[in-house]
């Protein structure tokens, strides 16, 4: 997302965090974060299906108040009050592209489910389970295809995920895996799960670097690599290491949108391009 959209996402996220926070002196909150997650995902799906609605709710020529009023008219009867407030906050912002609004609502639906994990003290557990399950899908193309197949009913995918994860992973992990499989916008379940893991890491105040390497790394090498990457980016970085033999050697490091490619595969490709000039 570009500048305006990033600001819109941050503003809507602040509304989500404020609405789902446990009040001082209270042990619980009455806000159903799971319902909020379902609502936000439903609105994102609506915007994906209805480009006219998406354009109307992001129209920079319309005053913010007009866009929030339109959201209330269209969605007020279907959404929880907290969900509607988050959507109205989002549509009152400017967006670099109309599609960024639906992407932001999808991300916020993930964060709402992660609030459930936070309340359960299981955010780190969910983050790790999401990352590991994404890697499992990467190593099992047939399983990934079964979960991505647009012709397969959601009930079939949910049942498959239930057999794989129920009793083995936190309930929020299962919900997020089901959400990734149901995502009509992005489609790639493995990538979405990795994205969800990074969102969980961000909620824990951590920045994650995904490191792809051709060979397994020892703990000592991982520690040295982590220190070097932290120095490079000027902040503390947590590594998630992924084996990828196709790289042939070296490593590829991805932090957010920035990629540092030190793989043998990249160097061979560069040499090949030089020979063809």
UniProtKB/Swiss-Prot annotation:
Q: What is its main location?
A: membrane
Question: What protein am I looking at?
Answer: ATP synthase subunit delta
**InterPro entries with a match to the protein in the record:** ATP_synth_OSCP/delta_N_sf (IPR026015), ATPase_OSCP/d_CS (IPR020781), ATPase_OSCP/dsu (IPR000711)
- Quote the Pfam families the UniProt record gives: OSCP
Q: Mind listing the UniProt keywords for this protein, alphabetically?
A: ATP synthesis, Cell membrane, CF(1), Hydrogen ion transport, Ion transport, Membrane, Transport
| Gene Ontology MF annotations | proton-transporting ATP synthase activity, rotational mechanism
Which organism is this protein's natural source? Frankia alni (strain DSM 45986 / CECT 9034 / ACN14a)
Q: Which family does it belong to?
A: Belongs to the ATPase delta chain family.
- Outline the subunit composition: F-type ATPases have 2 components, F(1) - the catalytic core - and F(0) - the membrane proton channel. F(1) has five subunits: alpha(3), beta(3), gamma(1), delta(1), epsilon(1). F(0) has three main subunits: a(1), b(2) and c(10-14). The alpha and beta chains form an alternating ring which encloses part of the gamma chain. F(1) is attached to F(0) by a central stalk formed by the gamma and epsilon chains, while a peripheral stalk is formed by the delta and b chains.
Its membrane topology is listed as: Peripheral membrane protein
Per its database record, what is this protein's job?
F(1)F(0) ATP synthase produces ATP from ADP in the presence of a proton or sodium gradient. F-type ATPases consist of two structural domains, F(1) containing the extramembraneous catalytic core and F(0) containing the membrane proton channel, linked together by a central stalk and a peripheral stalk. During catalysis, ATP synthesis in the catalytic domain of F(1) is coupled via a rotary mechanism of the central stalk subunits to proton translocation.
Question: Which GO cellular component does the record give, naming just one?
Answer: proton-transporting ATP synthase complex
User: Subcellular localization, per the record?
Assistant: Cell membrane
Instruction: List, alphabetically, the PROSITE patterns matched.
Output: ATPASE_DELTA
Taxonomy, superkingdom: Bacteria
Keyword RNA-binding listed = no
């Amino acid at each position: 997302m570009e500048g305006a959209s990033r600001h819109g996402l941050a503003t809507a996220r602040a509304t989500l965090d404020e609405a789902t926070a446990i009040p001082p002196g209270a042990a619980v909150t009455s806000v159903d974060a799971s319902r909020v997650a379902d609502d936000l995902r439903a609105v994102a799906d609506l915007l994906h299906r209805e480009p006219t609605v998406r354009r109307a709710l992001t129209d920079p020529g319309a005053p913010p108040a007009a866009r929030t009023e339109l959201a209330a008219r269209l969605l007020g009867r279907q959404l929880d009050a907290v969900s509607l407030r988050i959507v109205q906050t989002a549509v009152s912002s400017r967006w670099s592209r109309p599609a960024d609004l639906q992407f932001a609502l999808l991300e916020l639906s993930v964060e709402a489910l992660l609030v459930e994990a936070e309340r359960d003290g299981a955010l780190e557990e969910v983050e790790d389970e999401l990352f590991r399950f994404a890697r499992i899908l990467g190593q099992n193309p047939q399983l990934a295809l079964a979960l991505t197949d647009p012709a397969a009913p959601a009930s079939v995918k949910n049942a498959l995920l239930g057999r794989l994860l129920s009793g083995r992973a936190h309930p929020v992990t299962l919900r997020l895996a089901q959400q990734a499989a149901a995502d009509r916008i992005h489609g790639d379940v493995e990538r979405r799960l990795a994205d969800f893991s990074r969102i969980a890491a961000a909620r824990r105040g951590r920045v994650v670097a995904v490191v792809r390497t051709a060979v397994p790394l020892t703990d000592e090498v991982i520690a040295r690599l982590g220190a070097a990457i932290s120095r490079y980016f000027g902040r503390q970085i947590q590594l998630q290491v992924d084996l990828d033999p196709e790289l042939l050697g070296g490593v590829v490091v991805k932090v957010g949108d920035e990629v540092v490619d030190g793989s043998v595969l990249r160097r061979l490709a560069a040499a090949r391009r030089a020979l063809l000039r």
